[in-house]
Curated annotation (Swiss-Prot):
Classification of source organism: Eukaryota, Metazoa, Chordata, Craniata, Vertebrata
GO biological process assignments: maintenance of gastrointestinal epithelium; regulation of glucose metabolic process
Protein name, entry field: Trefoil factor 3
Residues of the signal peptide: 1-23
Localization terms from the record: Secreted, Extracellular space, Extracellular matrix; Cytoplasm
Binding partners and assembly: Monomer. Homodimer; disulfide-linked.
Gene name in the database record: TFF3
Location (main, coarse): secreted
Top-level division of the source organism's lineage: Eukaryota
Key words, A-Z: Cytoplasm, Disulfide bond, Extracellular matrix, Secreted, Signal
Annotated function: Involved in the maintenance and repair of the intestinal mucosa. Promotes the mobility of epithelial cells in healing processes (motogen).
Ranges of residues in domain P-type: 30-73
GO cellular component, one term: extracellular space
A Gene Ontology molecular function term of the record: identical protein binding
Length: 80
């Protein structure tokens, strides 16, 4: 019985550590430099910055009256 518990613990630790290695990288800062009047809403009222970023959006709560969670600029650079 102890061997099963030990193997289960090993499997859980391996799977847990591998999921940590694939962390969200976020957007380049320049992609979030959207003028306030051009922001396209990407969230919902009371969305947190973490929830917004996890959706692939930008978050800036410093300007009132415009969306805080908004779509980033389109990356026009080609990547190979």
């Amino acid at each position: 019985m102890e061997a099963r518990v030990l193997w289960l613990l090993v499997v859980v630790l391996v799977l847990g550590s591998s999921s940590l290695a694939v962390a969200y990288q976020g957007l380049a800062t320049n992609l979030c430099e959207v003028p306030p009047k051009d922001r396209v809403d990407c969230g919902y009222p009371e969305i947190t910055s973490e929830q917004c970023v996890n959706r692939g959006c930008c978050f800036d709560s410093s300007i009132h009256g415009v969306p805080w969670c908004f779509k980033p600029l389109q990356d026009t650079e080609c990547r190979f």
